[in-house]
Amino acid sequence: MKAISVLSGGLDSLVTSMVAKKENSEIATVTFNYGQMALDKELKSAKKISKVLGAENQVFDISFVKEFSKSGLNTGNIPNPKKDDLDDFKESEKTMKSVWVPARNMIMFSIASGFAEGINAEKIYSGLNKEEGVTFPDNSTEFINSFNKSLEYGTLNKVKMYAPLYNLDKVEIATFGKRLEDELGLDILKYSYSCYRDNLKDYLHCGTCESCMRRKRAFESAGIVDPTNYILQ
């Protein structure tokens, strides 16, 4: 069966792409340029991951969202939360709003659906997960179910989106990812890029943005060696 995986280059989308690789005979990956500050590093990561997985990587330009987005991911005004803030809903909600790109996931998944239908793929894999679903509404199970309902009417071949990590937090994702890496005989986790910033060097993370902090905590709490290089440990 043919499938596509939405691959930003981050840990969640990498693990999801490994699941897609395991479950399907042929996969392709799609990556999006929405004018994000970390674009170059994300593209580098996505291309490398795709090569290791033996998947063709397609990049779509949706940088027009910069015209109406005030997100820190586009402007560079990215907050550095405290570690204790990660489990504080009010503080996490503030961070979420500061990096929210209007309708980003809706736009990306709609394009991914069209691409999937065009190449006759039946599945779209996404890295939506439980931890981010707490604050990001477009990571929730409600979003997944609603989007799949729209696909029943919006595509002829009834493409369906799968989110294999929907019930996992970051610690569980890191654990699952390491198990998949070993099972598939790959050395690939080190190529993921989670940072909101472009730190000039490939795969180098700032260590202070929310995404980096959640990544660090995930590997540490899972008891797994973190393959990531951080500017600030």
Curated annotation (Swiss-Prot):
- Indicate whether ATP-binding appears among the record's keywords: yes
Explain the purpose of this protein. Answer: Catalyzes the ATP-dependent conversion of 7-carboxy-7-deazaguanine (CDG) to 7-cyano-7-deazaguanine (preQ(0)).
Native species: Methanococcus vannielii (strain ATCC 35089 / DSM 1224 / JCM 13029 / OCM 148 / SB)
What Pfam families is this protein classified in?
Answer: QueC (PF06508)
Q: In which pathway does it act?
A: Purine metabolism; 7-cyano-7-deazaguanine biosynthesis
Read off the InterPro entries from this record: QueC, Rossmann-like_a/b/a_fold
HAMAP family recorded: QueC
EC number(s) recorded for this UniProt protein: 6.3.4.20
Which residue pairs form cystines in this protein? none
UniProt protein name:
7-cyano-7-deazaguanine synthase
**UniProt remark on cofactor binding:** Binds 1 zinc ion per subunit.
Q: Which family does it belong to?
A: Belongs to the QueC family.
